[in-house]
Amino acid sequence: MSDGRAIPSADRAADLALWIVVAAGCALFVLRPTLTGRAWTPQVLLAGYAMLGLVAASAPVARPTGRSMHPIVVAAAGVVAVVAAAAAVGPSVPLPRTAEVLALNSVAAVAEELFFRRLTYGSLLRFGTLAAIVGSAVAFALVHVPIYGTAAIPVDLGAGLVFSWQRWASGGWGAPAATHVFANLVAVLR
């Protein structure tokens, strides 16, 4: 197909491998809380984020047929949404305000956006734009349950929907990654 929504491959093994990578990536994100509190935690998380980001960046996924808004405009809209949400939601999860925490949260945001907005969204595009937006947002919200609990599902789903909208509106994963980094920094620093 040449409509820009389907991966141009008749190879079912490649499709299966792609879905295995998506499932394995979700499992890695879900298991993050089991790694906390150890001396080697930052190094393991950084290595995991780097590996997942590289796989997500290099996997063959559907490319959008066009974008409707400039990525900077889309990122700016995301920043406005983050500021409004931070004002409305109240206190965040208490995290240490160290350079290590800020850096690791920023790297995590980029890896998550590569994974959810490039790989997962791109994989779901074959089922339509709505499936890609909602599916990647729901997966994003669910992998955060082990860290923040079920009470955070509405916030994480809302964030995932904003990031997925940004992916659709800009045609790429850069605007949602910039917004996600900003959101993580706001969460740690406020």
Task: Please name every model-derived segment.
Residues 87, 91-190:
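Transmembrane helix-loop-helix hairpins at the membrane interface
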